[in-house]
């Protein structure tokens, strides 16, 4: 397993160490010890530029995925996950959670997109949310996430970002995208995750 992590964020060193370790754990839990993954930790400004370039959406977002293969997840080289540390910090603050818990969620979500999961239809969104929750449970993150940011769901049950289905997230793709600009812009699809 190879996890490459680059931080373009001035405050990203600590988060980068966490994400590298968490990515290895997630890939192992998914049975993808053969995988190669690149993670890029960026500012809102940088992710906004990527979102505008590859998705024609001129706004910052939390995480983008750029699968290498078609279909996603078909080969050992999975692709790139780009995460905005600024967005993670802002949402964690507003939701009363630790930044690390927010980053874990974005990473799990991005990796699942690289493996072919999406949330275009309600059934797909549920399946993806269930897989995210499974990863969180496997890594012991659900209890911590609940302690850090408890939410009330329907019928009063506790919900957190690991167990809620994504609602405002879309996954359009554009052939030829690249997250880091280090690979040729051919046969890649970008997904907002």
From Swiss-Prot:
EC annotation from Swiss-Prot or TrEMBL: 3.1.-.-
One of the protein's GO biological processes: rRNA processing
Chain residues that bind Zn(2+): 109, 113, 119
Cofactor binding: number and manner: Binds 1 zinc ion.
Compositional bias annotation for Basic and acidic residues: 147-163
Protease recorded as keyword: no
Gene3D superfamilies noted in UniProt: Metalloproteases ('zincins'), catalytic domain (3.40.390.30)
Gene Ontology CC terms, in alphabetical order: cytoplasm
InterPro entries membership: MetalPrtase_cat_dom_sf_prd, YbeY, YbeY_CS
Subcellular locations according to the entry: Cytoplasm
Keyword set, alphabetical order: Cytoplasm, Endonuclease, Hydrolase, Metal-binding, Nuclease, Ribosome biogenesis, rRNA processing, Zinc
Cofactor(s) this protein requires: Zn(2+)
Compositionally biased residues, Low complexity: 164-181
GO molecular-function term, one example from the UniProt record: metalloendopeptidase activity
Cytoplasm keyword on record: yes
Top class in the EC scheme: hydrolase
Coiled-coil zones: none
Region (Disordered): 143-193
Function, in words: Single strand-specific metallo-endoribonuclease involved in late-stage 70S ribosome quality control and in maturation of the 3' terminus of the 16S rRNA.
Matches recorded under NCBIfam families: rRNA maturation RNase YbeY
Similarity section: Belongs to the endoribonuclease YbeY family.
UniProt cross-references to PANTHER family, sorted A to Z: ENDORIBONUCLEASE YBEY, CHLOROPLASTIC (PTHR46986:SF1)
Family matches, as HAMAP family: Endoribonucl_YbeY
UniProt protein name: Endoribonuclease YbeY
Organism: Anaeromyxobacter dehalogenans (strain 2CP-C)
């Amino acid at each position: 397993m190879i996890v490459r992590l680059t931080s373009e964020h001035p405050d990203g060193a600590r988060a980068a160490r966490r994400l590298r370790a968490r990515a290895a754990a997630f890939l192992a839990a998914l049975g993808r010890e053969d995988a190669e993954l690149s993670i890029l930790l960026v500012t809102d400004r940088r992710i906004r530029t990527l979102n505008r370039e590859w998705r024609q959406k001129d706004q910052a977002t939390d995480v983008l995925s750029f699968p290498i293969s078609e279909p996603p997840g078909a080969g050992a080289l999975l692709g790139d996950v780009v995460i905005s540390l600024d967005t993670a910090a802002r949402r964690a603050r507003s939701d009363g959670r630790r930044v690390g818990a927010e980053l874990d969620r974005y990473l799990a979500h991005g990796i699942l997109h690289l493996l072919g999961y999406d949330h275009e239809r309600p059934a797909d969104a549920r399946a993806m949310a269930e897989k995210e929750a499974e990863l969180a449970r496997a890594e012991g993150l659900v209890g911590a996430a609940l302690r850090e940011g408890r939410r009330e769901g329907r019928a009063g049950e506790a919900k957190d970002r690991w167990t809620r289905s994504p609602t405002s997230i879309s996954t359009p793709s554009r052939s030829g995208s690249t997250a880091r600009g280090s690979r040729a812009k051919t046969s890649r699809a970008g997904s907002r995750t």
